[in-house]
Design a protein with these regions (language model features):
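Hydrophobic core of alpha-helical transmembrane segments in multi-pass integral membrane proteins
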Residues: 7-11, 67-78, 123-140, 164-169, ...
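Loop-centered beta-sheet repeat module
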Residues: 62-110
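Transmembrane alpha-helical segments
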Residues: 43-47, 51-54, 97-109, 160-175, ...
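Membrane-proximal cytoplasmic C-terminal regulatory module of class A 7TM GPCRs
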Residues: 204-218, 243-256
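Alpha-helical transmembrane segments and terminal signal-anchor/GPI-anchor hydrophobic tails
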Residues: 112-191, 198-206, 213-226
Length: 256
């Protein structure tokens, strides 16, 4: 639905409507394979019964061994050695590793997680995120290597994994006062991904607008602008998705 919607919106904007309407293009943009994350997520769901079976009756020691082996393959061999088995983490191999890590933390929450202090997790998250940011600045500006700079944010970069797990644990240890708001936003994050990513959706429009805004600022401030722009895009898409769901619910009630 959102792939088609983004296509029709792009048709209404002259700079992105050079070829006119094409039914084949419409079908192509509705195909989930255009978004790597969505396709890998679907595959992970299909594999989840098998993955659950593989860890159903194993002890924590064996479970840890599984995760260590996956880290060696995905991070050590894939990312650090730049092997084609998993160079960037944008594939099902990395999803399986993250799935195992999540299941391990869930199964051993009281033993390995419950005693952790959120302030130390925040420190780990901030430090790892800062190292990612500084590394990107150095690689992109001072070493002038866009390819390596983009690889720096690979999903199997150790710093990305550390910051992600720390952030996940912070939320796992936080008692939410208004879980309805959190759940509503979480339910719309996939729509944000579909609308903002890939050349098959709104990505060209978003990039063009940001390129124009980015040109108004010097380099240091451009990253602040990027953060603000990302927040605005996220808020607009989430707001639109929530509105669409409300309208659809009301329409269903009318025809019920």
């Amino acid at each position: 639905f959102y792939g088609a919607l983004c296509y029709f919106i792009s048709l209404a904007i002259p700079p992105f409507n050079s070829e006119g309407f094409s039914f084949l293009t419409l079908l192509e943009r509705m195909y989930p394979g255009n978004w790597w994350f969505l396709m890998e997520y679907i595959v992970l769901i299909l594999l989840s019964p098998m993955l659950n079976k593989s860890i159903e009756n194993i002890d924590s020691k064996t479970f840890r061994l599984y995760i260590i082996l996956l880290l060696i393959v995905n991070v050590g061999i894939g990312y650090c050695l730049n092997d084609r088995v998993n160079k960037t983490g944008y594939n099902i191999m990395n999803f399986i590793m993250l799935y195992y890590i999540g299941r391990f933390l869930n199964r051993n929450f009281e033993q390995h997680v419950a005693y952790l202090k959120r302030k130390w997790l925040w420190l780990v998250y901030i430090l790892s995120s800062a190292m990612l940011f500084i590394g990107f600045i150095i690689l992109s500006k001072y070493m002038d290597s866009t390819r390596i700079a983009l690889k720096w944010f690979g999903y199997n970069n150790p710093l990305v994994l550390i910051s992600s797990v720390a952030f996940f644990l912070i939320f796992a240890l936080t008692k939410m006062k208004n879980s309805v708001v959190i759940n509503t936003i979480a339910a719309s994050t996939l729509v944000v991904y579909i609308c903002h990513s890939s050349n098959f959706s709104m990505s060209p429009i978003i990039r063009a607008i940001f390129a124009k805004v980015n040109g108004w600022y010097d380099f240091p401030l451009s990253y602040v602008c990027l953060l603000g722009y990302a927040i605005v895009v996220f808020a607009v898409i989430v707001g639109f998705d929530v509105s669409m769901k409300t309208i659809i619910r009301k329409v269903k009630l009318i025809f019920k």
